[in-house]
Amino acid sequence: MPELPEVEVVRRGLEEHMVGRTIVSAAVVHPRTARNQAGGGAEIEANLTGLRVGATNRRGKFLWLELDDVAQQAPSGLGLLVHLGMSGQMLVKSPDATLNPHLRARAELDDGNEVWFVDQRTFGYWWLGELVDGVPGRVSHIARDLLDDALDIPALAAVLKTKNTEIKRLLLNQEIVSGIGNIYADEMLWEAGIHPRQKASRISLTRLVALLEAGREVMTRALDQGGTSFDALYVNVNGASGYFSLSLNAYGQAGKPCARCGTPIARETFMNRGSHFCNRCQKVR
């Protein structure tokens, strides 16, 4: 599943191509794309058409378009929420582009370009609704993420310190801190030298702050490299893959020597997914 850096890459691409553009038509091709919309795809099509994209925003793994009322020359109060799910792509295409068999929704812009939502596995979705304090109501419960300037890292570390549960479980909880998935949880824990199963309550505040700062640094590096792509399902708006997978130190490195000490990276099952760590550098204390 695309995590924060991958979604941010897509958001930036949409910002370049969509901000200031009016949506002249919209079509929801597959019903699952509008499964969370009370009025289904028809509601999205009717209400999205004619609105102008004022801004693109993101929180964690969710991105959205802030939509303006063209006639009123003011914000409409609506946002189009996009969740990429496991395989979703937002692609900017020319009107003569060959149709993709996994096209699920599309929006035509007033410059002639189209934005396609391509989703092979159909876990992603679009949702059009009101913004609450600038965030789509459907995801207003999602916590701030590590690249959010408004995130108070010491305060978040203090919250983690109160939890007597495994630190990785907390990092994956989108209502505590958003945008972290399996890849970046493993990478930031390796950077900080903390075992995924270490109880958060037994980690010092200083180390918890260092862990969160490491996560911010890892995600920034990933963003600079276009995100992490393991297959053709994650691409930016132009269809290009990221290459941070070449820089991973823990995730997917089972059996390879730790870049810090040379001990083979271990892999174990945790929360129905793989955890990757160094038994020497990341001891349970």
Curated annotation (Swiss-Prot):
PROSITE patterns: FPG_CAT, ZF_FPG_1, ZF_FPG_2. Pfam families: Fapy_DNA_glyco, H2TH, zf-FPG_IleRS. The keyword ATP-binding does not apply. GO terms for biological process: base-excision repair. A zinc finger (FPG-type) spans 249-283. The keyword Ubl conjugation does not apply. Its cofactor is Zn(2+). InterPro entries: DNA_glyclase/AP_lyase_DNA-bd, DNA_glyclase_Znf_dom_DNA_BS, Formamido-pyr_DNA_Glyclase, FPG_cat, MutM-like_N-ter, Ribosomal_uS13-like_H2TH, Znf_DNA_glyclase/AP_lyase, Znf_FPG/IleRS. It comes from the Bacteria. Keywords: DNA damage, DNA repair, DNA-binding, Glycosidase, Hydrolase, Lyase, Metal-binding, Multifunctional enzyme, Zinc, Zinc-finger. Gene3D superfamilies: 1.10.8.50, MutM-like, N-terminal. Binds 1 zinc ion per subunit. Its EC number is 3.2.2.23, 4.2.99.18. The active site is at residues 2-3, 61, 273. It catalyses: Hydrolysis of DNA containing ring-opened 7-methylguanine residues, releasing 2,6-diamino-4-hydroxy-5-(N-methyl)formamidopyrimidine; 2'-deoxyribonucleotide-(2'-deoxyribose 5'-phosphate)-2'-deoxyribonucleotide-DNA = a 3'-end 2'-deoxyribonucleotide-(2,3-dehydro-2,3-deoxyribose 5'-phosphate)-DNA + a 5'-end 5'-phospho-2'-deoxyribonucleoside-DNA + H(+). One of its GO terms (molecular function) is 8-oxo-7,8-dihydroguanine DNA N-glycosylase activity. DNA binds at residues 102, 121, 163. Monomer. Belongs to the FPG family. Involved in base excision repair of DNA damaged by oxidation or by mutagenic agents. Acts as a DNA glycosylase that recognizes and removes damaged bases. Has a preference for oxidized purines, such as 7,8-dihydro-8-oxoguanine (8-oxoG). Has AP (apurinic/apyrimidinic) lyase activity and introduces nicks in the DNA strand. Cleaves the DNA backbone by beta-delta elimination to generate a single-strand break at the site of the removed base with both 3'- and 5'-phosphates. This is Formamidopyrimidine-DNA glycosylase.
